[in-house]
Amino acid sequence: MHERYVPADVEAAAQGDWRAADAYKTKEDSQKPKFYCVSMLPYPSGKLHMGHVRNYTINDVMYRYLRMNGYNTLMPMGWDAFGMPAENAAMANGVPPAKWTYDNIDYMKGQMQSMGLAIDWSREIATCKPDYYKWNQWLFLKMLEKGIAYKKTGTVNWDPVDQTVLANEQVIDGRGWRSGALVEKREIPMYYLRITQYADELLNDLDGLGWPERVKIMQQNWIGKSFGVNFGFPYELDGEQKLLRVFTTRADTIMGVTFCAIAAEHPLATRLAQDKPELLAFIEECKRGGVAEADVATMEKKGVATGFSVKHPLTGEPVEVWIGNYVLMSYGEGAVMGVPGHDERDFAFAKKYDLPIKQVIASEGQTYSLDAWQEWYGDKETAVCVNSGKYDGLRYAEAVDAVAADLKAGGFGDKQVTWRLRDWGVSRQRYWGTPIPIIHCPSCGDVPVPEQDLPVVLPEDLVPDGTGNPLAKSEAFLNCTCPTCGAAAKRETDTMDTFVDSSWYFSRYTAPDAETMVDARTDYWMPMDQYIGGIEHAILHLLYSRFWTKVMRDLGLVKFGEPAKNLLTQGMVLNETYYREDAAGKKTWYNPLDVTVTHDDKGRPVGATLNADGQPVVLGGIEKMSKSKNNGVDPQLLIDQYGADTARLFTMFAAPPEQQLEWSGAGVEGASRFLRRVWSFGYGNREALAARAGFDAATLGDADKALRREIYSVLKQADFDYQRLQYNTVVSAAMKMLNAIDGAKGATPAVLRETYGVLLRVLYPVVPHVTFELWKALGYADEFGPLLDAPWPKVDEAALEQAEIELVLQVNGKVRGALKVAKDASRDAIEAAAVADEAFAKFSDGKPAKKIVVVPGRLVNIVV
């Protein structure tokens, strides 16, 4: 054992032992309770960031703690390896996405291994490998057989110059990110999955999940079960009587309709735009906008009047029809009723285009004004109908019932339950993804690839150039034979949404070598006992994975219907930001390591200068670590300088796992200092600690009893904190333990060995390398076995018992001292001891006690 703590040497030694023992390879074991903990698999972007370090350390701590407590634990890892960033990097560097991806995986895997993570690497998967995505294709074909997968046209962003489909984030101000061309919306055939068939189950099953409430609420809102009325505004066009259908949850406001808005793609818009250049121009402008709901929510709301009117179904009055850029054909009926008096978006639209605004609900004590929107205008809870004829005086529910009944009687519509959730479009016009296993035959049409011909292998040697899909230009991939008639045919060149890859990987971890999609091992491990990932995945990934799991269950592949029992959404890692702004308003961001900060006498930052030139930079405040703000900390530099254990200790100590973590260089230094203290104590007392002398707890001296009482008291709290995932307070407990052990005067070697052994086990899940090596060097491994599987220390309840207790002594309600009495002292004995104490004599001014109040176990108050 070396005198000085050298993290690189300690960590290399520990990891060498773990590799030699294949310490983290895990098998099913029916004799133990299982615990399957999974971190969301990373995209192989090139390097780990501190968010990764935090996530994987949380998982690792959980694994090690539960393994010591007798669980059969599993922590796997893989790579979410398909996706657009690889294509972009390939274009920038002139290399195939496969090479870029595999190189990144190799580097990031090395980084993970340097962290000492308890990963069973025999289960590693990469979603870009054929032995994985074969099962994406296989399940897709099963869903096609069951009618869960189907084909229909969908709207995409089309770059007319690059001749390619763009993702929403590649459309910047309506133009393609590479070409700068005005982007068009196009309708193309795509494959969809009927996630809407599972909407009720996806909604109801949230109740049984141990997930954060805000994640459940986000999913509930995304699924969006709505009770309302679907009805039509009648109109006549081209000699035909028709209905412009809308859905509303606010039928109580129907008498306030002053316009209707339709999507640019609505058939009525197309018909009305004939021979109207201004309408055609606006429709084309709308088609250049984003197709995502998020884009519509944030864009400027624009519209144009068609000059056409429909009739109000209850009053017969004309209602003007507008084309609105905020109405999506893919949501609802592609048309909405405009009630500017009681909908904030409609209010703003009406103000902008000078449309009528009618008040048709009122709220007691409130005054309606057309000047500005007020929140109560849209509040159905307090709403009472006014200016609504026969519906006046009705509250929300009563009004909806009455309006729905009248619409039904008139043949215009009825009540309906609708869902915000839409079927999942899985076709992507991209190269680097799972090929969709369909063959296009001129005679037979779309033909599924036979199961025995799976996987359809994606060629890995193509280099995208940004113009079209490389698969469409690859003769070797494209040309094939129809499996039905034998004629020359073409393969589907669309690939699957990468959310498909991440929807079931956790099940494949359980049986990575299976010749089927999953096997019996999957039902042993799944569902995950703990899933760990960022809140940004609360909706799409988590919702799609829940859907995918239910489909697998319904196909008889697994016995469970939810992927994860419990979910932890770890907080973001934050750091200071610094920048300069040029005359044009462009900001240049500087890394905190390149900046010197000055502080006032209270330690608050008051200024900063760039090290390179000594000139000032602006303090931008604390924000999430990101490339764009250049405020990230490279984990590898941290590990190289301080060691993995210091990085792990800081990320666990700085904040509870679910809260944001503010980066602190001083905090890292403090973590390093603490580990040096742990090592130094072990080295400095190595002879005493290595001696395996027993002891009789009943005959121990006061110093030994006091130390054991402190250690086991803290252990009790640390164990509780481990169970509730509050790892920051676990570290605090370990610090208390070290202070107690280091400060113990007169403790015997046997008790020092016992208590230091408790400390090493409490610290081990957080800092496994240094504790593992100390455990081995000081002979604990010879007694208890390697620290990996050493039993978790049990609290010695007898050590917590005290012969004496200390009570606060008050005189006339003011604290004047402390009183030691026997633990089982009677009230009379406590009162006698209190009046005999020198503090009473000193502060009673010679007056006798009038009254003595005893609060058992806490205090004595003498009133004079």
UniProtKB/Swiss-Prot annotation:
Q: What is its main location?
A: cytoplasm
The UniProt catalytic activity note for this protein reads:
tRNA(Leu) + L-leucine + ATP = L-leucyl-tRNA(Leu) + AMP + diphosphate
Name one matching Pfam family. tRNA-synt_1_2
> Is Cell division there in the keyword field?
no
Q: MF terms per GO, please?
A: aminoacyl-tRNA deacylase activity; ATP binding; leucine-tRNA ligase activity
Biological process terms in GO annotation: leucyl-tRNA aminoacylation
Q: What's in the GO CC field? A: cytosol
- Residues holding ATP: K627
Which EC number(s) does UniProt give? 6.1.1.4
Its localization reads:
Cytoplasm
Against CDD domains, the record matches this protein to: Anticodon_Ia_Leu_BEm, LeuRS_core
Q: Which domain of life is it from?
A: Bacteria
Per UniProt, the short sequence motif 'KMSKS' region occupies residue numbers 624-628
UniProt keywords, alphabetically = Aminoacyl-tRNA synthetase, ATP-binding, Cytoplasm, Ligase, Nucleotide-binding, Protein biosynthesis
Please report, in chain numbering, the residue ranges of the motif 'HIGH' region.
42-52
What HAMAP family does its record include? Leu_tRNA_synth_B
Please report which protein family the annotation says this sequence is part of.
Answer: Belongs to the class-I aminoacyl-tRNA synthetase family.
* The name this protein goes by in its record: Leucine--tRNA ligase
Give the source species.
Answer: Burkholderia cenocepacia (strain ATCC BAA-245 / DSM 16553 / LMG 16656 / NCTC 13227 / J2315 / CF5610) (Burkholderia cepacia (strain J2315))
